[in-house]
């Protein structure tokens, strides 16, 4: 079987729509009220691509090189992150000096990918865009993504080494996604700032876990189709 990593061109269009949705949501929050849904769309795609890539590696080598995977993630994410931090730090130094007090915490938490919980702990509201403008607000999503990049591959390797069948692995990821979504619903309280729910890893991981589940389910369906197309012996 050819395990070469597939480039799915359709994802580019979905990503573009998701980006535009988020941008227009922040520009016109009272008009484009559902634009923030671009974030979970991104998470689903990320979860799908990561697990699909690792699944192909396992099927090709019966092994997943986690160290190499994490090195590739760091190599890909850190240059852009550092560039963003430098640009934003320069901006607030010139135009928003009132934010300098939090700069060290922002940089430290962003580089170690726990910025979402740093924002929650410091009571920084994601939705208070008028009274608390902050160019670092959106770094919470990168932290959620990176935390799942750490956990999902380890779980996939563990499930494979335990001999779990693909449909069961997909089912476990799907159950994790449902648990995260249920936790979000439980934690949400009308009339209370939902930043802790919106930024929290446990309540926002459902999208990436759903993508991970779909990556495995898709392959199960492909295998089933191939099996059904085989000519039956007489």
How would you label these PLM feature ranges?
Residues 1-234:
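Membrane-interface helix/loop caps of multi-pass membrane proteins
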């Amino acid at each position: 079987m050819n395990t070469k990593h597939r480039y799915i061109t359709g994802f580019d269009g979905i990503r573009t729509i998701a980006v535009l949705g988020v941008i227009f949501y922040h520009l016109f929050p009272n008009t484009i009220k559902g634009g923030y849904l671009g974030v979970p769309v991104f998470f689903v795609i990320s979860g799908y691509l990561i697990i699909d890539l690792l699944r192909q590696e396992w099927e090709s080598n019966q092994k997943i090189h986690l160290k190499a995977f994490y090195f590739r993630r760091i190599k890909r994410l850190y240059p852009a992150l550092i560039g963003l931090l430098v640009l934003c730090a320069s901006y607030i130094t010139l135009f928003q000096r009132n934010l300098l007090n939090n700069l060290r915490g922002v940089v430290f938490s962003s580089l170690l990918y726990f910025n979402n919980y740093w924002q929650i702990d410091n009571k920084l509201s994601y939705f208070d865009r008028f009274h608390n403008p902050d160019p670092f607000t959106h770094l919470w999503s990168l932290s959620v993504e990176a935390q799942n990049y750490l956990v999902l591959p380890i779980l996939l390797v563990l499930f494979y080494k335990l001999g779990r069948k693909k449909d069961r692995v997909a089912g476990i990821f799907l159950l994790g996604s449902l648990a995260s979504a249920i936790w979000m619903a439980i934690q949400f309280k009308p009339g209370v700032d939902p930043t802790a729910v919106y930024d929290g890893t446990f309540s926002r991981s459902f999208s990436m876990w759903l993508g991970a589940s779909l990556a495995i389910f898709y392959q199960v369906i492909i295998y089933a189709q191939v099996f059904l197309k085989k000519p039956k012996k007489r």
